[in-house]
Amino acid sequence: VTALDYDDLATEYAKHRRPYPGLVEHIVERAGVTSDSTVLEVGCGTANHLAAVRRTTGARCIGVEPSAEMRKQAAEHPEELDLREGFAEELDFPEGTFDLVMSVDMIHYVREPLRYFQRAFAALKPGGHFLTVTDSDWAIRNRIPMARYFPATIEVEFARYQPVPALAGDLALAGFTDLYERMIESTYLLHEATKFEDKSHSCLHLIGDEEFAAGIAALRADLAKGPIEANQRSLALWGRRPL
């Protein structure tokens, strides 16, 4: 798989990415986040979800992200965020710091998920919640418009994403209990191809130029006939540090 430079992608992420519909509400409700909570997002990128949690609850929000350009874009949010350089497997916070540790569309970049989960477990308060938002095989196969117009992304994503049962197994090995899965789903009307033309999804950088060009041409042709019903699905995988 071709390596991606997320410093180069930061501008497009900031331009096109928004919090997933329904996800922040689910996070706040499931984890019971309040203004008294301390929340960590690992691999926060441009921090859209972290900023939304802060905006919704007033919680203290810390984001860890290795890309300097991603952190620069994240700092543009009006919400007060504590942004730090770092990697998932190298989390080094005092024991029992956080009420919630979360990551969104990040776990497939982590080479040693168990090590990350162990570090996150230690950083959580007893009773604290852990969340990783990822994609299931089914969701990857049924992404619209992605899988329809850029089918080469399916195998690319299968090569990147860990199977959800394997992640759940590692969470259990790390000590987490109360494991829980929830698919967050929404549909919307896609009116233009801009975010796909700009390759604001990392998987589009990992397919061939001819496959990309053919997909864009087909997408534009269908959009010329009217908007396309698209979907957004994310699998929320939860665990909890026992009391």
Give the label of every model feature segment.
Residues 105-106:
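Short catalytic micro-motifs in class I SAM-dependent methyltransferases
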Residues 102:
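A conserved beta-strand element that flanks and buttresses the S-adenosyl-L-methionine
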